[in-house]
Amino acid sequence: MRCPFCHNQDTRVIDSRAAEEGTAIRRRRSCPACERRFTTQETVLLMVTKRSGATEPFSRSKIIAGVRRACQGRPVTEDALALLGQRVEEEIRSRGVAEVSSHEIGLTILGPLRDLDEVAYLRFASVYRSFESLEDFEREIAELRAERTATQG
């Protein structure tokens, strides 16, 4: 690892420990040339396969941005969006795969979003599942009502 201060290629790891609930490793490093210390963080790169077949690195911020659009005008806080993004990322990373499809990410978002705000869930699901008619909305609303009745009764 290159020293960020003097650009020396030869640095030493002083300490390593798990970070971010085991999804990353923080390393404390020392540079023998300039004797300065710095911290690095290593994470496994998770790739997303898009519908077009292209791949790109996973981005929690893209998930939050997509859900934020569905939540426009709804009483959903930024903290709640951040927590949803974290839950989705943790769920996907817990599968232990190096590559995930954008479709799988969408499916993973639906559950936590339904718990967060049902209207935002309907908005997101209508785009994600390509609702084409009023009947699609009615069917989804009926499922939401049935779930609510089952959990209350």
Curated annotation (Swiss-Prot):
Domain ATP-cone, first and last residues per copy: 46-136
Gene Ontology BP terms: negative regulation of DNA-templated transcription
Zinc finger (unnamed): 3-34
Cofactor list: Zn(2+)
Details of cofactor binding: Binds 1 zinc ion.
Record-stated family: Belongs to the NrdR family.
Entry function: Negatively regulates transcription of bacterial ribonucleotide reductase nrd genes and operons by binding to NrdR-boxes.
Protein name, entry field: Transcriptional repressor NrdR
Source organism of this protein record: Thermobifida fusca (strain YX)
